[in-house]
Every structure is written in C-alpha cells, then in structure tokens.
UniProtKB/Swiss-Prot annotation:
It comes from Bacillus sp. (strain YaB). Binds 2 calcium ions per subunit. The gene is ale. Residues 114-377 form the Peptidase S8 domain. Pfam families: Inhibitor_I9, Peptidase_S8. Residues 1-27 form the signal peptide. CDD domains: Peptidases_S8_Subtilisin_subset. GO terms for cellular component: extracellular region. Residues 28-110 form a propeptide. This is Alkaline elastase YaB. GO terms for biological process: proteolysis. Its main location: secreted. The lineage of its organism: Bacteria, Bacillati, Bacillota, Bacilli, Bacillales. Digests elastin efficiently, has a substrate preference for Ala in P1 position. It is an enzyme of class 3 (hydrolase).
Amino acid sequence: MNKKMGKIVAGTALIISVAFSSSIAQAAEEAKEKYLIGFKEQEVMSQFVDQIDGDEYSISSQAEDVEIDLLHEFDFIPVLSVELDPEDVDALELDPAIAYIEEDAEVTTMQTVPWGINRVQAPIAQSRGFTGTGVRVAVLDTGISNHADLRIRGGASFVPGEPNISDGNGHGTQVAGTIAALNNSIGVLGVAPNVDLYGVKVLGASGSGSISGIAQGLQWAANNGMHIANMSLGSSAGSATMEQAVNQATASGVLVVAASGNSGAGNVGFPARYANAMAVGATDQNNNRATFSQYGAGLDIVAPGVGVQSTVPGNGYASFNGTSMATPHVAGVAALVKQKNPSWSNVQIRNHLKNTATNLGNTTQFGSGLVNAEAATR
C-alpha cells in the first residue's frame, strides 16, 4: 500500500484542512514516530481510513491539528500502521472508536546465552574483548554441519565413506556451538565466538570411529597449527597408538581437551586419562557432579554438562547431557586465554585454567574446580 497522508483537526464538529509551508512540514515529518492504532471494529477502521484519504477527521477534544501518515492497513485485524507526532497521541486516544495506540517498537531476533556459558562467566571475558580471535580450534568429532550460528574455517575427514566434514550425527555440531556459536543475535552464544573453527571428522554418522582415524585427526591438528583440539569422545580401554598421538600433538603445541566419560565410574576414561590430555568432567546447574560424569584422580577440571543448549544440523538447536558437552566449555575458555596470552604454551594454558578454576571441593569429584573464564582472563 502506498503511503497516504491525511490532515486531522481535533475539535468538536470542526473539519478543516491546513497547508503547511515546506519548512514547517519538514520539521513536522522529522518529529513523527511510528505507531500502531488498534480499532474496536474493522468497519470503523475503514471509515477512519476514508477520512484520512479525504483529509478530514474530527474527534471531541480541544481544537488542535493532528497529522497522520498512513503506512499500512491490515485486512485481518483492525489495526493501522501510521506515523504521527508523539504529542498528538493523547488527542487521538479520545476517539471512542480507537481501542489503543502503541509504539511500533523494534523487534529483533533473540539470542540465548545458555546457562553453562553464563556459569563459566564467558560473557564477562567477552566484554573485555576476549572472544577467541586468532585462535584455531579443532573439533575431533562427527564433523560439523553448516549452520547460521557457526563460522567453519575448514577441516578434514578421516572416516571411510564420509569424505567431507558435514555432520551426519549431530554430536560434533553441538560441541562446536558451545565453543564457537556466533554473537549474532540469533540462536545461542558460544564461549569463544570468534575462534577459527575446524571440523575434524573422526567419528561417523553412527557416532563411532576407529583409533587409527582419531590418531590421524590428531596428526592433522598438529600439522595444521591448531592451538586446541576438543575431543568429546572416549573409550573404556586404552590404546598405545592413541596415547602416542596425544603425546605427539601435545609436543607440537596442541592443547588436547578430552571428556572424562559418561559411565559415572570412579575413574577417567580414555583418551582423557592420558597425562597429556586435559580431562574434563561435568556439573549440573547446582554445581554438583553430574551423576553420569566419570571422576577420579586423573580429573583436571569440570564444566557444565547437563541441559546444554547448542547448535544442531539443519540450523536448529537442542539440549544435551554429557561430559561431551562439558569439554567444549573448557576448550572455549582455553581459546580466550590463548588470545589474551598468545605466547603461552599449551602447558601454560592448561595450568592457568586449573589455577583459576572455581573450587567446588573434593578434587576427586571436581578436579581443580569449575572452569572460570572471568578469572582466567583477568
């Protein structure tokens, strides 16, 4: 609908039309704001529009000029979108045919900050300018699917029959979102939204993979200058090959962050149990150890892992439980620390995360405590 402008004169049975000079009209136009006028009936609204078209309208009030620019007439609800001077609203509200007048307020897409992101105090670190810029993070998982809330820089696949990094399972995309979901007013927010994110597919669409594939993924991370490798995967059995790969990646400068496991047992799973992997357990909203989270002497640190909302394939979002969900919180905070201290080694970053963690008590249950982005970026 074309924009229509009508002159309204508020006054008892007084119907006139006044011409403004161009300078006055321009000033009046600049003073106008957008409003929505709701009418009690559709028919009455149509009569109102006809009067605007004819530059005629009257209401019982003190005589004063009211000018309305009609922007849109809804045909399924009795509402008009208009522009008018805010000072004229009171006069229009005296019309008994008008049910309400409200500002045509701005509405934006809503971004949710998941509880875990707040719990590790990532938004405070981000407000200081630490968002992971310049830090390369590899997610060794089921791949990462394209998503409006993720910026993927590249990656590689080491799963036979699945040559690209697209995620046929969903797990890797969820992990990636906790690390790196963009600060873009949609969906969710990650711990380190500006990291350089890489998908390294070592698990197939079924959610499983081989030791050789995971070792190749670690080799890729080392050879391609990754600063951090997130491994939200594990096994109850150790592997000499896997341990060598973790050790070599660490020697190459990669901080390997791994999930402690989900059996609830009092020992840490593999590869998190290896000395050169940072073992991450899970906590709930009450800072208790999640019942499924494996624990023990080898546990380094904990992070939120219950009801973690993040990205999933298909531009969607969902909530999950697991130490797999806790681990990317730690990987993300590690990226913030690396940005703040670019010369620090992976060993320095690991120690710093442990030294700045929030003490939750029993070290067997919680390691050094809850990862704390605010304290880690002071």
